[in-house]
Amino acid sequence: MIHAILKMGDPRLLRVAAPVERYDTPELRALIDDMFETMAHAQGVGLAAPQIGVDLQLVIFGFERNDRYPDAPAVPRTILCNPVIEPLSGEMEDGWEGCLSVPGLRGLVPRYRHIRYSGYDPAGQRIEREAEGFHARVVQHECDHLIGRLYPTRIRDLTKFGYTEVLFPEMDPNAD
């Protein structure tokens, strides 16, 4: 089932999500299926449960190709419960981000370039991976939703925040 995606200004996006405590349940599987369907419908590269009003530490991400980020390399399809992020260096990298909860806007956001992330899959099996570049950016962006943080709060230079159609006129206006 496709869910409505909460938009910036909705106070539910500012809450800290609760940990997933029960794995491998029909309810968790149904939620994950709904999240993937919602993400695909919105042409997203990731989605966090709080974005559809579910206060759980659950994120999904991954794509082969995405019209909203045409130059981005593929990111493996991942389901991550109770994620933890560890920067593997202090190197930060600025990159343009958008968000399904902040439609039509983009901002230049600093993120760690190289991270390790860990958590659990829907069956409760531990996941641990390293990521760099756009993959690392997507993981950090989605995990921010679990602590009630949206990407505009990370922007250092507000002259690098605006409407996608103004900042990137060459992009398809329906892509964001």
UniProtKB/Swiss-Prot annotation:
Note on how the cofactor is bound:
Binds 1 Fe(2+) ion.
Function, as annotated, reads: Removes the formyl group from the N-terminal Met of newly synthesized proteins. Requires at least a dipeptide for an efficient rate of reaction. N-terminal L-methionine is a prerequisite for activity but the enzyme has broad specificity at other positions.
Q: Give the required cofactors.
A: Fe(2+)
Q: Which residues bind Fe cation?
A: 99, 141, 145
Give the protein name, as stated in the record: Peptide deformylase 2
- As recorded in UniProt, its EC number(s) are 3.5.1.88
**What processes does the entry annotate via GO biological process terms?**
co-translational protein modification; translation
Task: Name the chemical reaction catalysed here.
Answer: N-terminal N-formyl-L-methionyl-[peptide] + H2O = N-terminal L-methionyl-[peptide] + formate
Query: Which species is this record about?
Result: Bordetella bronchiseptica (strain ATCC BAA-588 / NCTC 13252 / RB50) (Alcaligenes bronchisepticus)
Supply one GO molecular-function term.
Answer: metal ion binding
Q: Which family does it belong to?
A: Belongs to the polypeptide deformylase family.
- Provide this UniProt record's keywords sorted from A to Z: Hydrolase, Iron, Metal-binding, Protein biosynthesis
Active site per database record = 142
**Annotated Pfam families:** Pep_deformylase
Q: Name the HAMAP family on file.
A: Pep_deformylase
Supply the InterPro entries for this chain.
Peptide_deformylase (IPR023635), Peptide_deformylase_sf (IPR036821)
